[in-house]
Amino acid sequence: VKLKDFMWNGWLRLGIATKPAAAWNPVGGFSDAFGRMLWLAVGDPALLPAPHGGNWIPNRVSVNPKPVAVAVAIPKDAVRPEPGTGLLRPVGGGRIAQQQFRYSVRLSAFHHGIHTGVADIIYPYIFAFRWGIQGPGASGALDPSVARSTALVREWLAGFKVIRVEEQVMNYGADLKFSYRTPVVDVYLNHRLSDPWERSRTDQRPRSLNPNPRSNDPWEEASIAPPWSTLPWEVIVLMEEAVRRGIAAFSDGEARRRGVPWLDLVRDKETGKRLAVLAESLRLEAYRPDALKGLV
């Protein structure tokens, strides 16, 4: 791993005891020791585990929790993805949430030079509801592994609303000045970790991204459904379309069941050729998923 832009600039050599075995895709791959280490090195999560203690620190998002002792009303123009399709539907009037967070999301450029946009940071919500559950109008695509990994988001997310996009300047003195576009997003949750109902649960499902959460720490709840994506929405859509068309499957189990390759975006040359053809086809038709129409 090359460490650049740090005061200890140099090379860090990492090793593991076993050979890489899992496919390289961030949805249902990177599931072995090498893959997890690789994704930790190149991924850029919304929040990072604090090096001391069991809570979280900001990375791509900062969070301003709205302290409420009782339930909070969700604005009627907030949206929530429709189960099975991912289409963004207005929550409507009279809906209640147990918790509200206001996220400021620091955008920057992806590695190919295109800047992150609002569509990128909300697309994981759409994906979780589109691929994690069957519903009216669904494409019939369901991967049990994806359903399990996105269950917490579907259970907790009551709605979200993009409030505005701000310009943020980080001034480090001299000529070190960085400017960022910063969407402000309100996210509403169905539960709170301090609920007696949550404390009494026996299903052993992880309550947040932290395996040992502190129920009184607002950052735990903030880690459940932050508006952020490490990938451009176009890459996620390319993977979705590849899976939907039978080119590959997100997870190893589903690949075995369907008799198709486990989706590997980097090392599988044959799948790479088919993905390139598919990407060009989607580009020529200016394809956009229905859930993003109006945003891109």
Model-derived regions: residue spans:
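The feature preferentially marks the first beta-strand/turn patch immediately downstream
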Residues: 1-296
